[in-house]
Curated annotation (Swiss-Prot):
This dioxygenase system consists of four proteins: the two subunits of the hydroxylase component (HcaE and HcaF), a ferredoxin (HcaC) and a ferredoxin reductase (HcaD). Pathway: Aromatic compound metabolism; 3-phenylpropanoate degradation. It comes from Shigella flexneri serotype 5b (strain 8401). The gene is hcaF. This is 3-phenylpropionate/cinnamic acid dioxygenase subunit beta. Part of the multicomponent 3-phenylpropionate dioxygenase. Converts 3-phenylpropionic acid (PP) and cinnamic acid (CI) into 3-phenylpropionate-dihydrodiol (PP-dihydrodiol) and cinnamic acid-dihydrodiol (CI-dihydrodiol), respectively. One of its GO terms (molecular function) is 3-phenylpropionate dioxygenase activity.
Amino acid sequence: MSAQVSLELHHRISQFLFHEASLLDDWKFRDWLAQLDEEIRYTMRTTVNAQTRDRRKGVQPPTTWIFNDTKDQLERRIARLETGMAWAEEPPSRTRHLISNCQVSETDIPNVFAVRVNYLLYRAQKERDETFYVGTRFDKVRRLEYDNWRLLERDIVLDQAVITSHNLSVLF
C-alpha cells in the first residue's frame, strides 16, 4: 500500500463502508447496487492451507473462484433474491456485517483509494441456522464529485478453508 491518507479522508471512506454494510443488512440491495462502480470486480477465492515451507518459497496451492462477478452479475443475483423464488433465502437471512481494522491508502490512480478491512459476517436463518464468515477484504473505492463514493473492487478473503454453511447466497 502507498501513502496513508488524512484522518478526515479515512473517516469519510469508513463511513461509506459502514453505510454500505447497513444497506446489505437491511436488504436494501438496489440501494447497495447504486454504491457500486460500473466497473466493479467482486471476487472471492477458495482458501487453501499451504505448508510453511511452501509459503517461504512463495509457492501457493491453486485456488478456485467462488465469486468473480461484474455489476451485471451482481444485479442478476439481486434480481433473483427479489423474486421470492431463491430458495436459499427463504425465509430471508438476517445478517450483520461488522468491519474493523480499516486501513486506507492512496493508489497510483487519482481519487481511487485502497482499503483493507477485517470483517465478520454473521448470518442467521430459520430458527437455528447460524454461520459466521470471518476474513479480510481488499476494497478499492473511487471518490466522485461532491464527496460521493463508489465501490470499484472487492476481493474477499475467507479465513475458513471449509465453508460449513448450506450456501453462499449472502453478499459481503
